[in-house]
Amino acid sequence: MSSRYLLSPAAQAHLEEIWDCTYDRWGVDQAEQYLRELQHAIDRAAANPRIGRACDEIRPGYRKLSAGSHTLFYRVTGEGTIDVVRVLHQRMDVDRNL
C-alpha cells in the first residue's frame, strides 16, 4: 500500500507563499531547500499518519507536525491517506487561521 496525501487549496497556497517569501529573503536555493524540507514532512506524515501529535483541542480529528518554522495541520481521511489542511508559520494564530 502506498502512502498518499491531498493538499487543500489553502495548503497549496500556503506552500506557494512560503516559497515566495523565502525566495525574496534568501534566494532560490534556500526557497527550494525549504520546500523540500516541508515536502519531506508531508511525505513522512503520509507514510505514517499517526506521526503527528493529535490536536483535537484545536479541531477534532486534526493532527500537527512541525517542519522547520512551520506546522502542518492534517487529518487522516482513510487507510494510508491524509488531507493536509494548512501549513502555518509558528507565529500565526492557529485558531484564526484554521
Curated annotation (Swiss-Prot):
InterPro entries: ParE1/4 (IPR028344), RelE/ParE_toxin (IPR007712), RelE/ParE_toxin_dom_sf (IPR035093), TA_system_RelE-like_toxin (IPR051803). Keywords: Toxin-antitoxin system. It comes from the Bacteria. Pfam families: ParE_toxin. One of its GO terms (biological process) is symbiont-mediated perturbation of host process. Toxic component of a type II toxin-antitoxin (TA) system. Upon expression in E.coli inhibits cell growth and colony formation. Its toxic effect is neutralized by coexpression with cognate antitoxin ParD1. This is Toxin ParE1. It comes from Mycobacterium tuberculosis (strain ATCC 25618 / H37Rv).
